[in-house]
Amino acid sequence: MQVHERSHTGGHTFQCNHGNEKKAPAAGKVHSEGGSARMSLLILVSIFLCAASVMFLVYKYFPQLSEEELEKIKVPRDMDDAKALGKVLSKYKDTFYVEVLVAYFTTYIFLQTFAIPGSIFLSILSGFLYPFPLALFLVCLCSGLGASFCYLLSYLVGRPVVYKYLSDKAIKWSQQVERHRDHLINYIIFLRITPFLPNWFINITSPVINVPLKVFFLGTFIGVAPPSFVAIKAGTTLYQLTTAGEAVSWNSVIILMVLAVLSILPAIFQKKLKQKFE
């Protein structure tokens, strides 16, 4: 016996078979899916190379650095890398304000677009380099734009990956999205504040399960603010930190939990009122 779960997403259908029977896929279908995956990979690599070329141009017009400083200009992988990078950027920030800002902006968006680790250290660095209001706006904007570009990338070429490797998880999240469809922006904000779903998973599956881009961007822009607040505040004491984990205290965790609950309260009240009047 077969039980089918379906989630219709923009002309595409998720389908899972539960049971002991498994039908062998038709040869034509396998060939078609293989060709689609190869084409998607080719497009993805082309887009990545174009983005990498933009990054190269940005750093080509960066201020001339010494060999020692050039070694420190890299995506931070730990707190020591972040401190070294912060030292170099702070040296040139006042004289080459626009160049440093553009380099920070493009790097952050590049990492977010291609789901490359390291943006947490850039969030911490923003608190070290810039005044708090500018740093918070910059991180929220970069996160919103980078996540939206990742969304668009998934919309263009990521569907075969989602269908092949993440279909079960995507079906479950699709069901959650449908339950929260009337207050979707609150749900996206809640997910961005909390660690229940990885950000990369939210980014690449959202277009497949019909989360509107506008709602996705606004929910991300607002939702990343509370955790970014914590990282930016930690950045003001950058040289006292030894790991990224030290940026998060129990007080900040409690505050994030409270904000997460507040973000979903309007949806809960709306649902209760709707049930009452029905």
UniProtKB/Swiss-Prot annotation:
Disulfide bonds: none annotated. Keywords: Autophagy, Endoplasmic reticulum, Lipid transport, Membrane, Neurogenesis, Transmembrane, Transmembrane helix, Transport. Pfam families: VTT_dom (PF09335). It catalyses: a 1,2-diacyl-sn-glycero-3-phospho-L-serine(in) = a 1,2-diacyl-sn-glycero-3-phospho-L-serine(out); cholesterol(in) = cholesterol(out); a 1,2-diacyl-sn-glycero-3-phosphocholine(in) = a 1,2-diacyl-sn-glycero-3-phosphocholine(out); a 1,2-diacyl-sn-glycero-3-phosphoethanolamine(in) = a 1,2-diacyl-sn-glycero-3-phosphoethanolamine(out). It is a multi-pass membrane protein. GO terms for cellular component: endoplasmic reticulum membrane; mitochondria-associated endoplasmic reticulum membrane contact site. Residues 127-238 are annotated as: VTT domain. GO terms for molecular function: phospholipid scramblase activity. InterPro entries: TM41A/B (IPR045014), VTT_dom (IPR032816). It is found in: Endoplasmic reticulum membrane; Endomembrane system. The VTT domain was previously called the SNARE-assoc domain. As there is no evidence that this domain associates with SNARE proteins, it was renamed as VMP1, TMEM41, and TVP38 (VTT) domain. Phospholipid scramblase involved in lipid homeostasis and membrane dynamics processes. Has phospholipid scramblase activity toward cholesterol and phosphatidylserine, as well as phosphatidylethanolamine and phosphatidylcholine. Required for autophagosome formation: participates in early stages of autophagosome biogenesis at the endoplasmic reticulum (ER) membrane by reequilibrating the leaflets of the ER as lipids are extracted by atg2 (atg2a or atg2b) to mediate autophagosome assembly. Belongs to the TMEM41 family. This is Transmembrane protein 41B.
